[in-house]
């Protein structure tokens, strides 16, 4: 079976395709301008660590993934500091909240409480185990400039997000193109001619195969070059490094080369 058209197109070309949401279009243009398809997962526990990591890796990333609920001192200083650095370094913020409850509950989790996610996260994600109404509920609660990734697959061993669940994620995404910008998945899920979903892949680390807790690692070359995904998500491989700035740049270079190899290969066949 031939590979999907989005693998043969540049990020810049995809940004202008019909039905591409404003946030997705901005992200694709940002990726092309900065030459980075790297998202760093900031799995740290204090505001100081979060903001310091954002400063150190900001020039090498297109997106920073956060877990606000593990920040012990999360508050206004966290929010304003993160927004300031994101604007200065030109990256988007993705809160990995993994919403997965009934509609009225996820609306409150998104807009209220101490985290106030709607104020600062450009992108959020959700399971669709509760049913497609979760997409409607989050969409109704958001400003126009917020977008959703559906958690369609995971990188942990033995996870149940396979087969019919993943297929249904794609079905629901196609019904909501103005809000759903893509997926968290291990491979591109673009299959139909009009699909232009952005796929982000976690579990990327150089020189490791697992962590002993179920995580299974892949390389940038495998997920971008072979699986056709768009953005790699790297956590411990960067935030656990002594020189975080240099390590982020190493991942950026390898992921970008994998993308260029894919794109140039298909451009030469046109």
Curated annotation (Swiss-Prot):
Keyword Lyase in annotation: yes
Entry-linked InterPro entries: Aldolase_TIM (IPR013785), OMPdecase (IPR014732), OMPdecase_AS (IPR018089), OMPdeCOase_dom (IPR001754), RibuloseP-bd_barrel (IPR011060)
An individual GO BP term: 'de novo' UMP biosynthetic process
UniProt catalytic activity: orotidine 5'-phosphate + H(+) = UMP + CO2
Entry keyword set: Decarboxylase, Lyase, Pyrimidine biosynthesis
Signal sequence residues: none
Sample GO molecular function, one term: orotidine-5'-phosphate decarboxylase activity
Residues the record marks as active site: 98 (proton donor)
SMART domains per UniProt: OMPdecase
Gene3D superfamilies assigned: Aldolase class I (3.20.20.70)
Known EC number: 4.1.1.23
The keyword Cell wall biogenesis/degradation is assigned to this record: no
Ligand binding (substrate): 43, 65-67, 96-105, 217, 236
This protein's pathway: Pyrimidine metabolism; UMP biosynthesis via de novo pathway; UMP from orotate: step 2/2
Family to which this protein belongs: Belongs to the OMP decarboxylase family.
Name of the protein in its database record: Orotidine 5'-phosphate decarboxylase
Taxonomic lineage: Eukaryota, Fungi, Dikarya, Ascomycota, Pezizomycotina
Gene name tied to this protein: URA3
């Amino acid at each position: 079976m031939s590979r999907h058209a989005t693998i043969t197109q540049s990020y810049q070309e995809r940004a202008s395709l019909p039905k591409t949401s404003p946030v997705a279009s901005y992200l694709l243009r940002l990726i092309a301008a900065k030459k980075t398809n790297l998202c760093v997962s900031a799995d740290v526990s204090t505001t100081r660590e979060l903001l310091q990591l954002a400063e150190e890796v900001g020039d090498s990333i297109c997106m920073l993934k956060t877990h606000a609920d593990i920040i012990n001192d999360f508050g206004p200083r966290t929010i304003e500091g993160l927004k300031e650095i994101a604007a200065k370094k030109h990256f988007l913020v993705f809160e990995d909240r993994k919403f997965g409850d009934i509609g009225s509950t996820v609306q409150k989790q998104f807009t209220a409480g101490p985290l106030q996610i709607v104020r600062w996260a450009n992108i959020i994600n959700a399971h669709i185990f509760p049913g497609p109404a979760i997409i409607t509920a989050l969409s109704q609660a958001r400003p126009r400039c917020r977008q959703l990734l559906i958690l369609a697959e995971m990188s942990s061993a033995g996870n149940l997000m396979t087969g019919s669940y993943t297929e249904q994620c794609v079905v629901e995404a196609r019904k909501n193109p103005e809000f759903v910008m893509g997926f968290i998945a291990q491979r591109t899920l673009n299959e139909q001619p009009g699909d232009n979903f952005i796929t982000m892949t976690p579990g990327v680390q150089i020189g490791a195969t697992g962590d002993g807790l179920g995580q299974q690692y892949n390389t940038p070359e495998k997920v971008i070059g072979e699986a056709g995904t768009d953005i790699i998500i790297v956590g411990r491989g960067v935030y656990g490094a002594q020189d975080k700035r240099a390590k982020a740049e190493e991942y950026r270079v390898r992921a970008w080369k994998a993308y260029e190899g894919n794109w140039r290969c298909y451009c030469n066949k046109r």
